[in-house]
Design a protein with these regions (language model features):
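Short, low-complexity disordered leader/linker segments with a strong preference
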Residues: 1-32, 389-393
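A residue-level marker of the well-folded mature domains of exported/periplasmic proteins
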Residues: 25-393
Length: 393
């Protein structure tokens, strides 16, 4: 009897130990989380800051060692150096926000010494990663594999989360027209797939709202050719606002500065991107400039993935996958991975309210409203006249 009791007690003691392990036997306490910034800092009020805050909150709450590392400069080599530094320091979950980490993943994912490290990349698409396997000609077109024995792939120690940008772009365009704006602009950074999806979604949303209101809308459309603002881009924005553009969706890193500078001078408006940019834009350029922001759920994607890997032990569900995140809840818009902000969007009674937004999200979730993610051609529209101006640089 005593022997049986001892066996039962021993088995019971194993239960919490097993619960703290993932499927490979790694215990929660064995994990250390590092975040590498792309080329900004954790105060950028965008990708880096949001990812940092999600990592820190999760790790603090679960008593997990966490540190962030900032590369010395904006290059793949400098980002790889920080990844290596973090791993040398014992960090075995590496979180990397932004498409700029595609080259980093390409260089580290197949290293034998990193096979047990888990790389979590946000907004690194299949296009971004697989493009690194190729040589390119002077036009940027692919010109054959760098190594014929190393074909494009994603390794089992990598998970990438990407987003349905066309959906939150649609929401932003729909909201802008519903709020009464009929002269719009889209200023993209570089014409990479994510930015194009934002832009084409914006066009589709504006057209849908214009149809409902039986209005005609004009929309200027251009790419800056870079992810930062400068005098040349600001000059184009000055021209747009000067000729009647009311609000510009500035989509691409720091390129919003050119739109916001021009908007401030002309009394115009802007729409932010990726995160709720109202605080940073309004804080620098004037209260009320930001109409809304087309947001990606960087925070929940980071937090949820860390929980799934560390607490739930479900890395096998993520390993070697590139997963596209979008709408997951038709009843609570704040739980989705793509959305516009409830707090800072300039909702207006009789035009576009929080209830109107909730209905839009519900209809999108239920499939009553569909949005194309085709990036090969400008969407077909009926009530929006698009002036596609190509690119500035």
């Amino acid at each position: 009897m005593k022997k049986l009791l001892a066996i039962i007690l021993a088995a019971l003691m194993l239960v919490p130990m097993l619960a703290a392990c993932d499927r490979s036997g790694t215990q929660k306490g064995d994990y250390k989380v590092a975040m590498i910034t792309d080329y900004g800092d954790i105060t950028d009020q965008s990708f880096n800051q949001t990812t940092y805050e999600a990592c820190k909150e999760y790790c603090d709450a679960n008593k997990i060692d966490f540190q962030y590392f900032k590369p010395a400069g904006d290059s793949t080599e400098e980002r790889v150096a920080k990844v290596e530094e973090a791993i040398d320091g014992g960090y075995n979950i590496i979180v990397m926000p932004g498409f700029a980490f595609a080259g980093t993943l390409y260089q580290v994912q197949d290293k034998e010494e990193y096979k047990d490290v888990k790389f979590i990349a946000l907004d690194v698409s299949e296009y971004d990663l697989f493009d690194c396997f190729y040589k390119h000609d002077e036009t940027g077109a692919r010109a054959g594999l760098i190594d014929e024995n190393n074909k494009e792939h994603i390794s089992e120690n990598v998970y990438c989360a990407v987003y349905k940008e066309e959906l939150c772009g649609y929401m932003a365009g729909y909201a802008a027209v519903k709020l009464g704006y009929t002269h719009l602009g889209f200023l993209g950074g570089m014409a990479v797939p994510a930015v194009v999806r934002y832009g084409y979604g914006f066009v589709q949303g504006a057209d849908a709202a214009a149809k409902e209101l039986d209005k005609k809308v004009e929309l200027n459309y251009i790419y800056g050719g870079q992810f930062n603002g400068d005098a040349d881009i600001t000059a184009v924005m000055d021209t747009w606002y000067g000729k009647g553009t009311e609000v510009v969706f500035a989509c691409g890193g720091g390129i919003y500065t050119s739109a916001a500078e021009a908007a401030k001078k002309a009394g115009g408006k802007v729409i932010g991107v990726d995160v709720d940019q109202a605080a940073i834009i309004d804080g620098k350029y004037g209260k009320g400039i930001t109409v809304t922001s087309a947001m990606k759920g960087l925070y929940p994607a980071t937090y949820d993935t860390l929980k799934a890997v560390i607490i739930d032990g479900k890395w096998a569900d993520y390993a070697g996958k590139i997963v596209t995140l979008g709408l997951v809840n038709g009843d609570d818009a704040t739980k989705n991975y793509v959305q516009i902000p409830m707090d800072s969007t300039q909702f207006a009674d009789g035009k576009f309210t929080k209830d109107d937004y909730a209905k839009l999200v519900k209809d999108m979730f239920d499939g009553k409203v569909t949005v194309s993610n085709d990036t090969t051609k400008m969407p077909t529209v009926t009530n929006v006249t698009v002036d596609d101006q190509g690119k500035i640089k």
